[in-house]
């Protein structure tokens, strides 16, 4: 894959772009395809730009961790200055176009999403506190709320409640992955939760958070969803997440934690698709 594409973190940002799209479709009475295409383009630029900036800012961390050492910057595939200019150009284009093409309120959420990931998470918190992902997680809320605001023209309580499904899922997902690579994070000096506390405590916290996230998603769909097919999708994701989280609590092993990570990964996607079916 082209290293400039890798900088965008396509395997990560597609879910945030999907949350914007789902927010719009869920809120809009009818889908305006020109608005939807503009939303996808703007989200790709802004979210991809923030991801590329994260690559640039964390290039020393990536070089110190075996999982990330082959990324474009530590591997020397792209000059550092080029990566910085590329990330800022994409970000500026995405934020500017969001106000022009989508309007002030969706544009505000696009800008806030970029700010929470690129500044709050990447610059301010990542290297300083285990709360980093809790601060940066609001970028996930912003993606859904931006799409919702485009579809409805405003943001209401249901939109905020639904957006917190993303917020709760992010730390449970990231910390489960960080548990597997906790030694890498310690070596790099990054205070991710599983790298700084007792391993058994990490398992308990992450597993309970996964269960709480799954239960919250199920409640949201029962409250705001309208499709039996959607409910079936959500229930499948919830069942897999809860079952593997209970297994992790019982075994407290690396194998069980990885099973939980893999099983809980699809639940947010299933929930978002279920909202579309509604």
UniProtKB/Swiss-Prot annotation:
The keyword Phosphoprotein does not apply. Its EC number is 2.5.1.141. The chain crosses the membrane at residues 12-32, 33-53, 83-103, 105-125, 130-150, 157-177, 204-224, 228-248, 257-277. It catalyses: heme b + (2E,6E)-farnesyl diphosphate + H2O = Fe(II)-heme o + diphosphate. It is found in: Cell membrane. Signal peptide: none annotated. It comes from the Archaea. InterPro entries: Protohaem_IX_farnesylTrfase, UbiA_prenyltransferase, UbiA_prenylTrfase_CS, UbiA_sf. Pathway: Porphyrin-containing compound metabolism; heme O biosynthesis; heme O from protoheme: step 1/1. One of its GO terms (biological process) is heme O biosynthetic process. Converts heme B (protoheme IX) to heme O by substitution of the vinyl group on carbon 2 of heme B porphyrin ring with a hydroxyethyl farnesyl side group. Belongs to the UbiA prenyltransferase family. Protoheme IX farnesyltransferase subfamily. Carbon 2 of the heme B porphyrin ring is defined according to the Fischer nomenclature. This is Protoheme IX farnesyltransferase. The lineage of its organism: Archaea, Thermoproteota, Thermoprotei, Thermoproteales, Thermoproteaceae. The gene is ctaB.
